[in-house]
Every structure is written in structure tokens, then in C-alpha cells.
From Swiss-Prot:
Highly expressed in fetal heart, intestine, kidney, liver, lung and skin, and in adult heart and ovary. Intermediate expression in adult kidney, lung and skin. This is Tumor necrosis factor receptor superfamily member 12A. The gene is Tnfrsf12a. One of its GO terms (biological process) is regulation of wound healing. It comes from Mus musculus. The chain crosses the membrane at residues 81-101.
Length: 129
């Protein structure tokens, strides 16, 4: 009886492999695989792909289990909020740049020395006359 077990193991494996091949040849869907595009799921009852958008109206349909969670709704205010925030940042940057420029310009008036004695290009005689 102990010698029958090793001989029957290959037979069981071959039988199991044959069943898998027959199931694949019959066209049945293996669990976890789907020939459907995104947004749709395979219905075993109807034997075709069904749109997941109909699941809120009929949540107990067999294909709704294959649909992912409801897709997130589009946030319609995203672009106006993003545009407003970027505009605010731009305005604040311009105002702060103007204030810094104005402050530096006020200090700049007294930092430029005025040449009172003349230079090499201006003789001292010309200053006296």
C-alpha cells in the first residue's frame, strides 16, 4: 500500500493539469483575471463585460464585486483654488520686491560719493575760474 502513493501522485498532478487546461479551453474566466478594460468588470451571468458605472443603481449585480471602489469624484474647484493661490503668491512676491527695492533706493541716495576735488581729467585751475 505504501508503494501505491508515489505512483498515484504523478497521476493526480497530470489530472489536475488536464482540468486546468480544459477550463482554459472552455473560455471560463479564472478568478482574479479579467479581459475587460478599466471601468468595467466581467459578469459571469451575462457572459460579457459590464460597465462599473451601473453599480450604484444596481449594487447587488454579480459584476459589481469585480469593480474597484467607486472612482473618486473630480474636484471641480481644484483649478480655481490653485490659480487663486498662485496669483496671491505672485502678488505678494511683487509687492515685497517693490518694498525692498524702494527701501534700497532710499539708502542709495547717500552712498554715491560726489567728486568735489576734480580728478585727472579736470585740472584744478578750471575749478577756480
Amino acid at each position: 500500500m505504501a508503494s501505491a502513493w508515489p505512483r498515484s501522485l504523478p497521476q493526480i498532478l497530470v489530472l489536475g493539469f488536464g482540468l486546468v487546461l480544459m477550463r482554459a479551453a472552455a473560455g471560463e474566466q479564472a478568478p482574479g483575471t479579467s479581459p475587460c478594460s478599466s471601468g468595467s468588470s466581467w459578469s459571469a451571468d451575462l457572459d460579457k463585460c459590464m460597465d462599473c458605472a451601473s453599480c450604484p443603481a444596481r449594487p447587488h449585480s454579480d459584476f459589481c464585486l469585480g469593480c474597484a471602489a467607486a472612482p473618486p469624484a473630480h474636484f471641480r474647484l481644484l483649478w480655481p483654488i490653485l490659480g487663486g493661490a498662485l496669483s496671491l503668491v505672485l502678488v505678494l512676491a511683487l509687492v515685497s520686491s517693490f518694498l525692498v527695492w524702494r527701501r534700497c533706493r532710499r539708502r542709495e541716495k547717500f552712498t554715491t560719493p560726489i567728486e568735489e576735488t576734480g580728478g585727472e581729467g579736470c585740472p584744478g585751475v578750471a575749478l577756480i575760474q
